[in-house]
């Protein structure tokens, strides 16, 4: 498993490192570079999207 990837429960908190590449979780809270996690309702977010500031939306979400 890639150490930069992490898994967290749906609606949980991602607690991963600076280079985290979350691809399988729906986080409500983002820590560090875990922002590519898709928020609830954005399950089809593209890999590599980023958070819009402090909001719970990804850059690839409508």
Curated annotation (Swiss-Prot):
Binding site for a divalent metal cation 2: 8, 14, 16, 27
Role description: Seems to bind zinc and copper. Could play a special role in regulating zinc metabolism during the differentiation of stratified epithelia.
Name of the featured protein: Metallothionein-4
Keyword Metal-binding part of the UniProt annotation: yes
Tagged with keyword Metal-binding: yes
Record: residues binding a divalent metal cation 1: 6, 8, 22, 25
Alphabetical list of InterPro entries matching this protein: Metalthion_dom_sf, Metalthion_dom_sf_vert, Metalthion_vert
Family: Belongs to the metallothionein superfamily. Type 1 family.
CC annotations in GO: cytoplasm; nucleus
Binding-site list for a divalent metal cation 4: 34-35, 45, 49
PANTHER family noted in UniProt: METALLOTHIONEIN, METALLOTHIONEIN-4
